Amino acid sequence: MTAYSVSPSGEKFKIPEACQYAEEMARLEKLAAQARAEGKEIVVVMGVGFVGAVMAAIIADTVDKTTGKPSKLVIGCQRPSTRSYWKIPLLSRGQSPVKAEDPEVDPMIARCVLQKKTLVATFNSDCLGLADCVVVDVQCDYAKHELGNMRSGEAEMSALEATMRTIGEKIPPGCLVLIETTVAPGTTEFVAWPIMKKAFAARGIAGEPLLAHSFERVMPGREYVSSIRDFWRVCSGCDAEARRRVEKFLREVLNTEQFPLTVMDRPIESETTKIVENSYRATILAFLNEWSLFAERNGVDLIKVIHAIRMRPTHSNIIFPGPGIGGYCLPKDAGLGYWAYKHILGFEDGDQVFRISPTAIDINDTRALHVAELTRDALRNMGRYIAGADVLVCGASYRQDVGDTRYSGSELVVRKLTEMGAEIRVHDPYVEHWYELETQDVYPAPGHSWSRFFRNQSGLKDIRVQKDLAAAIRHAEAVILAVPHEAYLKLDPDQIVGWAGQPLAVVDCFGILSDDAIRRCFELGCEVKALGRGHIQRIKEQTRSKASGST
C-alpha cells in the first residue's frame, strides 16, 4: 500500500520508495562536489522542524566575511515518516515547513533554496557521509504520566539516541557534530558520545568523535530569526578540538560580534545552563501563582502590584503568569534535569535535592484549571450553569501575537471546561489549526495528548479556530480572554455585549481589562472574574451601589 505524508494544509506527499534512495544520493553527491569546488563547507542539519528549518536557513545564508560569497551548502535531512516527510518537499520548493510571524523567515528560506541554492532538503540520511559538520535538531521531550506530577515523567531519548547512532555510522572522521537540542544534562558526554564512539570502533575508526553542544534560545514571534542568529550563545565540546571547532563554526554563522559566545569547559555545563535558565523562569512564574490566589481572595489587583514592582530596576522583568506558561521549553526542562540526575548521573536522592523545580512545573501545569473554576463561578453568579453553556475562548496560543499552541494554558482551559460540560468555541487571529485538539489521537505523539487526563474529550477534534471575532462571540454566555493578543487589548465592553446579544460572563486571564472596562461590564449586566485581580469585587460593589443610588 502506498504511504503518504500530509502537510498541515492537507497536501499529500508520497513517501519515497527504496529504489529512490540511490538516485537521491547521487543528486546530493553532485551538489556537494560542486559546493566543495566553490570552497563551501557541507553542513547537514538533522531535523527541519521548529528550530532546525530556520537554523538551516541561517547557516545557508552565511557568507565568507572576507569575500562576501556564500560559504556553506546546507542539507536539511528529515526522516521519511508519514508524520514528518512532508517537510522535505515543502523545503525543496523554497517554502518554510514552519509557520512563523517573523517576516524574515519565508524570504530567507526562498532565497537560500531558489536563488543562492545553498539549501537543499533530503530524506536520505546517507547525506551524513558528505558532511563537514552536522547540526542535530531532533526533539528530546519529557513525557509526564500524570497531570500535576512532574516526577512521574521521563525523558524520551529514543529519537535522539537513534539519530546519534545513525550519525556515528555514517559521518566521515573529522566531522564536527553539534547537538543543538535542549537535552538532559549529561546527554552529550554520557549518552551521545559513547554511542558515536562505539559506532566509530565498529567502522574501524581509531579517532575520537568531535562532539559539541550549544543550545538555542529560539523565541517564536516577529523576531524568530533574530532569536537564533542575533542572540547570545553558550557552547562546549567533549574535548579541546571539539570546543575549537564549534566555536569557529558558531562565529561563522551567528552574529557573535554583537552577541559574544560563552564557551564552557564541558558539555554538561552548557546543557545545565539551558535547564537552569528555563527552570528559573518557570519557578518565578509559579511563585506568582500563590500571590495571584492571595490577591483574588483579599481585594488586591496583582497586575498593579507587578507594575509597581517593575519600577525597581532589579525587578523589571517580573511578569504575570496568565493561565500557565506554555511553549515547548519551560513546561518540561526542569523535568529533564530531574530525570538526568538519576538515570544518567546515577544519584538516588533526587526527591530530596529537587524540591522547588518539580513543584514549580506542577503549579504551572495546573494553573489553567483555576480559569475553569472562575468561569463556572461567574456563570453561577448570573444564575447559569457551566454544563451546556456556550463559552468562547479568545486565544489558543501560548503567548501573545504568535500562532504557537504547544502546551498552551488555553488547551487545559478548554479541556477542563469540556469535561465540565461546556460547549467550546475558539478564536485566535494567529492560529490556523489547533493540532493538539484536531489531531489529539496522534499529536504531539500517540498516547501523549493531554486529553488522557480528562473525560469527555472526543468532540474537541471537531473544533476549528475562528477568525471573525464578532461571529465567534454571537450568543456566547461566557468569554475567556486567555491570551493578550493585540486584537483583544482594546475590546470595548459595549461591543462585546452587542456581539453576544446578551450580558455574559467575562474571565480575564492576563490583566487585559482596565478598571473602567470592568466597571462598564458590570453596568451592562455582565459578571467579571479574573486571575489575580481581587479588586474586581470592589468595583462590582461600587457599580451596583451607584446604580441602586440612582434609582
Predicted regions and their residues:
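Structural/interface elements that position substrates and couple domains in central-metabolism enzymes
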Residues: M1-T551
